[in-house]
Amino acid sequence: MNDVSTSHSSRAHNPLKRLLGFALAAFFFSTFLALGTWQVYRLDYKLDLIDRVESRVDAPPVNAPAAPEWPAVARNTHEYLSVKVQGELLPQYTTRVQATTVLGAGHWLLTPLRRANGEIVWINRGYIPVNEADPMTVENTQGQFEVRGLLRISEADGAFLRKNDPGNSRWYSRDVDALSKHNNLQMVAPYFI
């Protein structure tokens, strides 16, 4: 009698095990299918980005968008556009923004430029490695300049797991709105060069 009840009990658990196995297989199949689909979309996005960058980088520079054009500035139409802007650098507002590049850890050095009409455009003056001299001692440049470079869209909200901390002068993203508010600058372009 024990043999019959043991046999019946193991058969009752088999459908449950099969159902659980099927559910797990379906879950993993769906997850991997979703991840694969996401990778294909991401590849398409990256290839489109590379095409946009390559077509814009080597183009002759155009005048950077002025205030009336700022509402139309968008990542898909303006980012990496070769631009030029004229004005006076405001070195007293130069800010270090943490950067990690293929060259190692360091800082981007951002300085606002004031156009003749009063508009402000932040200029990324380049990368300075951590072990280099204090970037805040960079020579104060005076006079009118023409800057040529690539238009980049502001990077809001800090970096992954790190929020900008203006009170302690810790910047993790090139957030032109936050940089401008911290320095009480008005009429600031929503991009940097």
Language model features: what each stretch is:
Residues 2-76, 80-193:
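Surface-exposed, charge/polar-rich loops and edge strands
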